[in-house]
UniProtKB/Swiss-Prot annotation:
Residues 7-185 are annotated as: N-terminal alpha-helix. This is RuBisCO accumulation factor 1. It comes from Thermosynechococcus vestitus (strain NIES-2133 / IAM M-273 / BP-1). Residues 209-342 are annotated as: C-terminal beta-sheet. Pfam families: Raf1_HTH (PF18579), Raf1_N (PF18578), RuBisCo_chap_C (PF18087).
Length: 356
């Protein structure tokens, strides 16, 4: 970072620490600092603005900037306040944001009401009908949402509260009549139960797949092996950016792989292994295995099998060497994987139920 950038960063930090300007200035400052590489935690330590508040300010600023055609009265209203209100609008489309922002100003909504408005607009966003007398204005869409909830409510107090909420926002006369009708029509329409989320969780490290690039099938030269790009992943779900055309193999996240520096896989003839494999439990012959070699450990180790290259143009060899070799060490062998022996693949796709 240059001296000019250092000075600018210091100036922005000082303004934020002193809370100079409006919330929009604070959001712009936080965004600028994060783009310069400062972490939210570092900004918090220097300014006292907590990371969660930084995110709210930056997001609210983005929402404010998306209200391009908003009336001047709306833009002026949010100039010095309402970052928490605009933050709630982040889940809406650009058109709905503008309508909701205008509604906030007209009805002086607080953050709880804005949260409910956003939920209502999203809930009815996929229903484009006016069969019950509700139009497509933002007020009628919110009114329809509360009308739907009120019809499903057996408790009269809750039903009345929902009707009142709908009447607060509805704009059309027909929509208002539909809501007022519920004051005398106590028919309850059963709610359609929302399905449960298909939630899964990886309970052990080995359940998380570990992707290893595959260099190809032996024989391979050291040049080909070194040309395989190295993978990197992001936490928490180990998302991997894969170059186009790369082959991968998914393995359990065994500790030997997690500790590897730069692993790469090679399909290797079982007959060319430097030691004989023990027989498989099924007694089936093994023609090919998968080797995982760590290119980051390109040094001799008496206790490891090594992948060596007599020359860059010759095929690499797997060997155990009790003495340091004259050939180049390409990597150390991490594991030899035998092919899985699954008697019936269709069984893995069936649901199994067990009685306790």
């Amino acid at each position: 970072m240059s001296q000019d950038q250092d000075a600018l960063t210091t100036e922005v930090l000082q303004r934020l620490r002193r809370k100079e300007g409006t919330w929009q200035d604070w959001g712009a400052g936080c965004r600028q600092l994060q783009k310069q590489g400062l972490s939210p935690q570092a900004i918090f330590e220097a300014t006292g603005i907590e990371p969660i508040h930084q995110n709210q300010l930056i997001t609210a600023l983005q929402v404010s900037q998306s209200l391009g055609e908003a009336p001047e009265s709306v833009r002026a209203y949010f100039q010095t306040r309402g970052s928490d209100l605009l933050y709630e609008l982040r889940v809406l489309s650009a058109g709905d944001r503008l309508a909701a922002a205008t509604l906030i100003v007209e009805k002086q909504l607080d953050v709880t009401a804005v949260h409910e408005v956003c939920r209502a607009l999203k809930a009815v966003s996929y229903r484009k009908d006016n069969s019950e007398g509700f139009g497509e204005s933002v007020g009628d869409r919110i009114g329809r949402y509360y009308w739907q909830l009120a019809r499903q409510q057996r408790d009269l107090a809750q039903r009345s509260r929902l009707i009142a909420q709908g009447l607060r926002f509805v704009e059309s006369a027909s929509g208002r009549q539909a809501l007022e009708k519920l004051l005398t029509d106590f028919t309850v329409v059963p709610a359609v139960n929302q399905p449960r989320l298909p939630l899964y969780r990886l309970d052990t490290a080995e359940e998380v797949p570990y992707l290893v690039p595959v260099a190809g099938t032996a024989p391979l030269t050291a040049t080909v092996l070194q040309q395989v790009p190295r993978l990197s992943c992001t936490e928490v779900f180990r998302v991997v950016a894969v170059p186009q055309g790369m082959s991968l193999v998914a393995l359990p996240a065994w500790q030997v792989l997690l500790n590897a520096v730069d692993p790469v896989a090679i399909l290797w003839p079982a007959a060319d292994l430097p030691a004989e494999l023990p027989p498989s439990p099924e007694g089936l012959p093994i023609a090919q295995v998968l080797l995982v070699v760590d290119r980051g450990l390109a040094e001799w180790d008496r206790d490891r099998y090594l992948l060596i290259a007599p020359s860059p143009s010759e095929a690499v060899q797997l060997a155990w060497l009790p003495e340091p070799p004259t050939a180049t060490v390409v990597g150390q062998l991490l594991l030899v994987l035998r092919p899985p022996q699954v008697l019936d693949e269709s069984l893995n796709r069936e649901l199994w139920f067990f009685e306790e």
